[in-house]
Amino acid sequence: MDDRGPDVAPAVVTTADEIAAMEIRGAATIADAAAEALAIQAERSDAERPDAFERQLRAAAKTLYETRPTAVSLPNALRYVLAGMDGETVAELRASTIARAEEFQRDLAQAQSKLGSVGANRLRDGDVVMTHCHSTDALACLEAAVEDGTEIEAIVKETRPRLQGHITARQLREWDVPVTVIVDGAARRYLDQADHVLVGADSIAADGSVINKIGTSGLAVIARERGVPVTVAAQTIKLHPDTMTGHTVEIERRDEREVLDDDERAAITDTADGADDGLTVENPAFDVTPPRYVDAIVTEHGQFPPETVVTLMRELFGETVDEPWEL
């Protein structure tokens, strides 16, 4: 089946591979796919004993968890579904797991809609919003504003190296929002035309720091210098509860070929195979924006100053968080 475990369903492995390859992207989309994968694992499990069923579900969760270390929505989704796995028989465990996954997916869909309504309240007719990368939560705010009849425009950073800004631009044009696409290095120049910076988050730490696509921190610093408010749109599944107990957030490093493919590298170094060519390529996927550069974090529970999100974390997750896939 796969070297990640004989008990893991092929469909789960496929989902894990798609998350790792960023074919499934966006924190909410990743969380939804993870919940769906656990439901599929539960449905297709051939376990005959309850302990074997639980072992298979945890193995599936671990396979999914190991794909994206920074996207905290993934472990939060896995924790939620596994916490609802309950019963004394395989049939009961199967039914409870599937029901829990479906509940999570319903709540997830409603959360984004609620978040969008909160974020839309920050926008006024004629506002110009600068975006970075592609965030379904940030887009939910803009969509809600458009549906409310608010006339807005967008300045969209292309977001190298994977050009996720193109996805954002495409969606905004489908809503008839006027869009200006800019290269990343032009943000400082075009901030003079912006009323807001609106970004998403892959995760948010207990101190209010925002972990998001590389380039977010630099944009936030420049925006503060120019007096442009920075809003982070993030569902509470992106809060990182482990940071309450001193854990740090791992910054994912992606393949250097996203920046330079083999032919481009050879052209720079004038070597055929790139071995010992003296060229190093760094490709961190995310950076950390300190809370002092963020004006507000918008969630489905309302709008919060970044320094207060730890209170929300404690309400939602308690003081400690288990990793059930390790049990």
UniProtKB/Swiss-Prot annotation:
Keyword annotations of the record: Carbohydrate metabolism, Isomerase
Amino-acid positions noted as binding substrate in the UniProt annotation, renumbered to this chain: 25-28, 68, 212-213, 238
Protein name (database record): Ribose 1,5-bisphosphate isomerase
Annotated Gene3D superfamilies: translation initiation factor eif-2b, domain 1, Translation initiation factor eif-2b, domain 2
Family, as annotated: Belongs to the eIF-2B alpha/beta/delta subunits family. R15P isomerase subfamily.
Entry annotated with the keyword Zinc: no
Active site: 133 (proton acceptor), 202 (proton donor)
Something else known: Reaction proceeds via a cis-phosphoenolate intermediate.
